[in-house]
């Protein structure tokens, strides 16, 4: 199947509760906004072969009592357009996030009445938020949260992936449904050490719903953001599950060490999705982080 071009990508319907922005190359990007418009923005950037649905309705509702939540669907994922290009470009990923921030009306940290957004990247979302910070800087961002995140697709310590992620290359890009299902089932199982079956099946389903070409393009780019992280001046929180077999816990520690003043928190009962596996603690850590900004 040929990937859809930006010009033919459907805009999400208003009835879906999803809004849309248009990136610099014409790709339609979907996002959801929840919570008090006057609250501090929390921008959620999901991981590889996932979407804004990854966070789950219960967590999104809980976050919406604390923040103005902006949950993004990355290009090629969820309700966003499936562009043919742009997946290997740090500048394009930065343009995508900038388009969503513009459309959602997120002001800069120094603007009157604005405190700046918290940017939260989960898994591959750590690369995307780093792309944004490298290109656009910290002007709109008050704080950074990395959750089970990689910040590189390279030999950088911040890009250390585990066996569950490496196994994806053996069939996770296949168009044959049987091959893809068999491979991604293992990936989905590794996502969570605990948690309900509904959440686990949702995560698995989102991986299958992401076009095979998109799954491949994200993982065949080459990028690292070691210098980006070392140059940050905003507060940062790094959360990582101690049983993560998708992105190794060592990546979380390395990322925290590279960011000046970052706080690292290991979640002892979690694998790759601490926000679903240890939700009360995840919320408490976010509350404490936001209170210090």
Language-model segment annotations:
Residues 232, 238-240:
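Short beta-strand/loop motif that positions the catalytic acidic residue
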């Amino acid at each position: 199947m040929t990937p859809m071009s930006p010009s033919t990508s459907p805009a999400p319907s208003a009835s879906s509760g999803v809004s849309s922005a248009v990136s610099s190359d014409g790709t339609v990007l979907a996002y959801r906004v929840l919570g008090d418009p006057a609250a501090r923005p929390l921008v959620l950037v999901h991981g590889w072969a996932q979407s804004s649905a990854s966070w789950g309705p219960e967590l999104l509702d809980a976050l919406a009592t604390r923040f103005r939540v902006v949950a993004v669907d990355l290009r090629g994922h969820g309700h966003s357009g499936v562009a043919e290009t742009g997946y290997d470009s740090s500048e394009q990923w930065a343009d995508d996030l900038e388009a969503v921030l513009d459309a959602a009306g997120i002001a800069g940290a120094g603007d009157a009445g604005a405190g700046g957004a918290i940017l939260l990247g989960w898994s591959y979302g750590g690369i995307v938020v780093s792309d944004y910070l490298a290109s656009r800087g910290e002007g709109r961002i008050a704080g950074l949260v990395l959750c089970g995140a990689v910040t590189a697709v390279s030999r950088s310590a911040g890009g250390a992936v585990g066996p569950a992620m490496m196994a994806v290359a053996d069939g996770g890009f296949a168009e044959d449904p049987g091959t893809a299902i068999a491979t991604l089932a293992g990936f989905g199982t590794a996502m969570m050490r605990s948690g309900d079956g509904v959440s686990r099946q949702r995560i698995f389903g989102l991986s299958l719903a992401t076009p095979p070409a998109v799954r491949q393009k994200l993982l065949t780019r080459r990028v690292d953001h070691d210098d980006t992280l070392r140059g940050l001046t905003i507060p940062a929180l790094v959360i990582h599950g101690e049983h993560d077999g998708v992105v190794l816990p060592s990546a979380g520690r390395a990322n925290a060490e590279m960011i000046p003043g970052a706080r690292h928190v290991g979640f002892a009962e979690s694998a790759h999705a601490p926000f679903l596996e240890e939700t009360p603690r995840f919320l408490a850590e976010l509350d404490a982080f936001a209170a210090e900004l």
